[in-house]
Amino acid sequence: MIKNKFVRFLVLISICCLYFFSRLQHLTSIPVFGDEAIYIRWAQLIKSEGTLRFVPQTDGKQPLFMWVNAVILKFFSDPLVSGRIVSVFAGFGLIIVLFLLTAIFLSYDSKEKDIFRFLRQSIIDNFYPSIFTSLLYILIPFTFFFDRMALADTLLSFFGALCLFLVLLLSKFPRLDLSLILGFALGLAWLTKSPAIYFVVLSLATFVFLNWRQPKSFFLPIISIFIGFLIYNILQLGPQFQMIALRNKDYIWSITDILKHPLDPLKPHLIDTFFIYNKYISWPLLIISLAGLILLFIKNKKAKNLNYKYLVLICWWILPLIANAAMAKVFTARYILFTLPALIILISIGFTNFLNKIKSNLFKILLLIAVFILNINFIYKISVDPFHQKLFSTEQGYLTDWTSGWGIKKSADFLKQRAQIANVIVGTEGAFGTLPDGLQIYSNKISHLTIIGEGLGFTEVPAGLVDAKNHGDEVYLLINKSRLKINSNQLNQLKLIKSFDKPDDDQLLLFQL
């Protein structure tokens, strides 16, 4: 018994070490991405000035991720590391929740009446299937990629999985304390990103579905939703709360538009989902898991064991996915990341059931290697050499185009050195995004260094930069070659100081006036 506990303890420690090693190695090999630059810059502003804690709302974004990042910024000198660490720890919380979620899901039909004994027995009985779920999360490129980005999506996924875990517990043990905790989880999810509304609807639907014979207990999830709504309305303390709803309209089609063309964008977005799953999960894993689930359902049907609880996982995965595909104007992998926890549990259960049908341990090992070798290879390459990697078309902006920040940190290092001996003024392309925010995060609170976003499409050197030069300042212009529109006469008057290659044959150019 003691030996078994020690082995399980070692397995837990190994999973934790594997997670942190996989997420922290080469953490900044991918340069700052446009949205990362914006979120980190907001966090810096919040950290430096408390009255700006609601500044993300000016662009219609909920601020929880930035609030957490503002705290973490105190412990790291590199702002990009600070922002990405938030996602790393959100992902770590997610593997813990997935472990617990798998355990209680597999034991959901238990007759145990005490919640703590139920949790303990579920973990003991389903330890290794639950560990496999956590391992699966670590080895899927989909989750690996976004756990290492300073974006709010992994944090949203964590709260989504936590809400699913809590509503399953609440459904089995209808208690007011669980209802209150679920309400706080829903509220925090809502403070993270707008898609948390799916968790609100699904939590209520899940409870009603699993407790339809106990209508007197339906008030519990309603209390949860009420608490979540109260927490969300904290945002009304800040200015421009209405911008959240207005900006949401920029990302989704209205119901009227959807009814006019119900298959567009639904069909192309579902096709994109097919390729995203192929690239970032792998079809061998999905096909084997599906086969395992079918075998499990056939076995349960013969034993007259209903598979109703699996409908909960399927709905938490497929309904938000279809809703996003039908409504989203812009569709990328990160916008469906929050649907993955339920899918990962289904994959884990199906795959382990398929493995259990195989008698040869050698064949099991060979199958595991064959299924995961491509995923591990992708993880290695995107970590060590992202410059030469190709992502699916919906994700290319992380490595190519103006949204990728190749050369920005090196430009900032050079400019900070110059600021020690001169008053430096830097004009950049853009007014919001990778530039100038990407440069500002690396030069925050640096004396004698001022960064100005000059917008797009200018054909002459901005007058403000010329004036600064005439007043004796050291003046620079940072711009992507693909966006350089300055006429040849003025371009000849600029001195190219540095250039940084980008994977799409573009360059980031640093000129001095």
Residue ranges and their predicted role:
Residues 6, 128-131, 166-187, 362:
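Short hydrophobic alpha-helices at membrane interfaces in multi-pass membrane enzymes
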Residues 8, 12-16, 223-227, 300-301, ...:
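Signature aromatic-anchored transmembrane alpha helix within multi-pass, membrane-resident enzymes
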Residues 16-19, 130-138, 165, 186, ...:
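Short helix- or helix-capping micro-motifs
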Residues 63-67, 76-96, 146, 150, ...:
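Loop-to-helix entry region of an early transmembrane alpha helix in multi-pass inner-membrane enzymes
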Residues 106, 110-114, 119, 123, ...:
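Membrane-interface transmembrane helices that cradle and orient dolichyl/undecaprenyl
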